[in-house]
Amino acid sequence: MSIRSWPAAERPRERLLELGAASLSDAELLAIFLRTGVAGKSAVDLARHLLNQFDGLRPLLDADLSAFTSQLGLGPAKFAQLQAVMEMARRHMAESLRRESALENPTQVRSYLKALLRHEPHEVFGCLFLDNKHRVMTFEILFRGTINASYVHPRQVVKRAMAHNAASLILCHNHPSGITTPSRSDIDLTKRLKEALLLVDVHVLDHVIVGDGEPLSMVERGLM
């Protein structure tokens, strides 16, 4: 049975307009994005099927073009549309951070970094560069591969901080394993970078590790 034949109060789009997006299930939100179903399946039925196939919303959103379009009802146009929506969400978060101090909203900062790094299949290391009012200027990925104290060069981090005329920055990297517990190497690297940047009067405010669940703040853990 198509969604159009459902009672208005049960249709995902009408429920969203009346109750807000947060009140909808993952399947209902995905159904609105899909707009239509396939033969024998409503958009909601198709959404439930896709969530089951991908084992949840996050793997579906993180799927590459090949995996995404291998599923019935999903083509290149939908993939492009989804990527555009997610990029707009990231840019919305970035704009908000440019208008206020990162220190006043650490949760939003961590959410932004998670949105940037959680889909990376390998370890990456980046910096969120801040101005003298702790507002975000830009984000850069500086290193890819195994992140340790011998691989990440302080000279390159200092160089990029000075190029952006940053007053402070937030270090970040991801753990593809999903476990955010910092290693001894993570702690040593943070100390080295903090000392090197202090020589050019750039302050390291935090080191955020992105994995599954909530990102870890090394400052909040008392590790720096």
UniProtKB/Swiss-Prot annotation:
This is UPF0758 protein Psyr_0222. The lineage of its organism: Bacteria, Pseudomonadati, Pseudomonadota, Gammaproteobacteria, Pseudomonadales. A motif (JAMM motif) lies at residues 173-186. One of its GO terms (molecular function) is metallopeptidase activity. Belongs to the UPF0758 family. GO terms for biological process: proteolysis. The keyword Heme does not apply. It comes from Pseudomonas syringae pv. syringae (strain B728a). Disulfide bonds: none annotated. The keyword Metal-binding applies. Residues 102-224 form the MPN domain. Keywords: Hydrolase, Metal-binding, Metalloprotease, Protease, Zinc. InterPro entries: MPN, RadC_JAB, RuvA_2-like, UPF0758, UPF0758_CS, UPF0758_N. Pfam families: RadC (PF04002), UPF0758_N (PF20582). Zn(2+) binds at residues 173, 175, 186. Coiled coil: none annotated.
